[in-house]
C-alpha cells in the first residue's frame, strides 16, 4: 500500500522494515574481509525483529550473492547495497567523530531506528546523545540491547515521539539545550518524507541550532513527474528477487517521489556552510567500487553542513 502522511508502521512492516533492511546490510558489511564499519549489534537487532529473510541475511545464512542474479537489470544488487550502506554508515560515524573533536558535546539522531551508535561508538566525556523515534522502536531497541548485556557508551537520552508530532518540545523536555552547539544527523530519512515535510524538518533543525552546530543528511534527487513511474519500476525490480526468499514488501511504495528542494542549496540559503559529497566519491573514499550512473542510489549526495 502506498504511503500516506499519517500512516503507521513497526520494524517489520512498511517504512519501518527499511530500518531492519539497513541494519541487515550493516551486518553484512561488518562481516566483510576488510570492513569499512564494525557494528556488532546489527545482527542481533535484526534477528530480534523477526523478519526471517533479513535475519538470514544478517547472520550469513543467506548471502548477497544469493540475491545478485547474473544478468539481472534491477538498479542495484544486494552486494552493492551493502557497500552503499557501509559507506553511508561510515560517513555519519565520521561526522560525529569530527564534531566531537571540534568540541560539540550534544548530538541528535533523527529517526534513529536500529542505529546503535550510542553503544558502539566511542564518545568524549560530557557528551549527551539524543535519539528520536517512535515509542515502540525506542523501547524495542532498548530492551533488546539490554537483553544482550549492552550498555550505552555515553549519556543516551531517548525521545519517544513520531517526527510528525511536536518533537522539538519533547526534545527540550528530555534535556536538549538549543543554546549550545549540536551535531544532527538525518540518516536515510529525507526520502521517506513528503517534500514539504523535508523543508519543515530542515527549518526546525535550523531554529534549534546554535552557532557552531553541524548537520549531516542525505540529499535524494528530485524526481520530475515524467521520471517517477520509471523510478518506481526500478525499485520494484530491486525487490522482486527477494520475494522468492519469502520477503514480500514493495519498497517503491514507501518513498515519496516528486519534486523537492535541493538540500545543499536549501541549507546554503539559510546560512549553513555546506559540503556535498556524491555517493561515488564516498565509496571511493572508503575503498569501495563506485556505482554505475544508472544504479539505484548513485545520485544520492551526502551533505555536511555547519553554521
Curated annotation (Swiss-Prot):
GO MF annotation, one: methyltransferase activity
Gene3D superfamilies reported in the protein's UniProt record: Vaccinia Virus protein VP39
SUPFAM superfamilies, per the entry: S-adenosyl-L-methionine-dependent methyltransferases
Keywords attached to this entry: Methyltransferase, S-adenosyl-L-methionine, Transferase
UniProt binding sites for S-adenosyl-L-methionine: 133, 162-163
Coiled-coil region(s): none
Gene Ontology terms: biological process: methylation
Enzyme Commission number(s): 2.1.1.-
Positions of region (Disordered): 213-234
Domain of life: Bacteria
One Pfam family in the UniProt entry: LCM
Protein family membership: Belongs to the UPF0677 family.
Role description: Exhibits S-adenosyl-L-methionine-dependent methyltransferase activity.
Name of the molecule in the record: Putative S-adenosyl-L-methionine-dependent methyltransferase Mflv_5023
Amino acid at each position: 500500500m502506498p504511503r500516506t502522511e499519517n500512516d503507521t508502521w513497526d520494524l517489520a512492516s512498511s517504512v519501518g522494515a527499511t530500518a531492519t533492511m539497513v541494519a541487515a546490510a550493516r551486518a553484512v558489511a561488518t562481516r566483510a574481509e576488510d570492513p569499512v564499519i564494525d557494528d556488532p549489534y546489527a545482527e542481533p537487532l535484526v534477528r530480534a525483529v523477526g523478519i526471517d529473510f533479513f535475519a538470514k541475511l544478517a547472520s550469513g545464512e543467506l548471502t548477497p550473492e544469493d540475491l545478485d542474479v547474473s544478468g539481472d537489470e534491477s538498479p542495484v544488487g544486494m552486494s552493492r547495497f551493502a557497500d552503499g550502506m557501509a559507506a553511508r554508515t561510515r560517513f555519519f560515524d565520521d561526522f560525529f567523530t569530527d564534531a566531537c573533536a571540534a568540541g560539540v558535546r550534544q548530538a541528535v539522531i533523527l529517526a534513529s531506528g536500529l542505529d546503535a551508535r550510542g553503544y558502539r561508538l566511542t564518545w568524549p566525556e560530557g557528551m549527551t546523545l539524543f535519539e528520536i523515534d517512535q515509542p515502540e522502536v525506542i523501547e524495542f531497541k532498548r530492551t533488546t540491547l539490554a537483553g544482550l548485556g549492552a550498555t550505552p557508551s555515553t549519556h543516551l537520552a531517548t525521545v519517544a515521539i513520531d517526527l510528525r508530532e511536536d518533537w522539538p518540545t519533547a526534545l527540550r523536555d528530555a534535556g536538549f539545550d538549543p543554546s549550545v552547539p549540536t551535531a544532527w544527523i538525518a540518516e536515510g530519512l529525507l526520502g521517506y518524507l513528503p517534500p514539504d515535510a523535508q523543508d519543515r524538518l530542515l527549518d526546525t533543525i535550523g531554529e534549534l541550532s546554535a552557532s557552531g552546530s553541524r548537520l549531516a543528511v542525505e540529499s535524494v534527487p528530485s524526481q520530475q513527474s515524467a521520471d517517477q513511474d520509471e523510478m518506481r519500476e526500478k525499485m520494484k525490480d530491486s525487490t522482486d528477487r527477494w520475494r522468492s526468499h519469502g520477503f514480500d514488501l514493495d519498497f517503491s511504495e514507501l518513498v515519496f517521489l516528486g519534486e523537492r528542494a535541493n538540500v545543499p542549496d536549501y541549507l546554503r540559503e539559510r546560512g549553513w556552510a555546506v559540503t556535498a559529497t556524491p555517493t561515488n566519491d564516498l565509496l571511493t573514499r572508503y575503498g569501495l567500487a563506485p556505482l554505475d550512473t544508472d544504479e539505484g542510489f548513485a545520485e544520492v549526495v551526502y551533505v555536511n553542513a555547519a553554521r
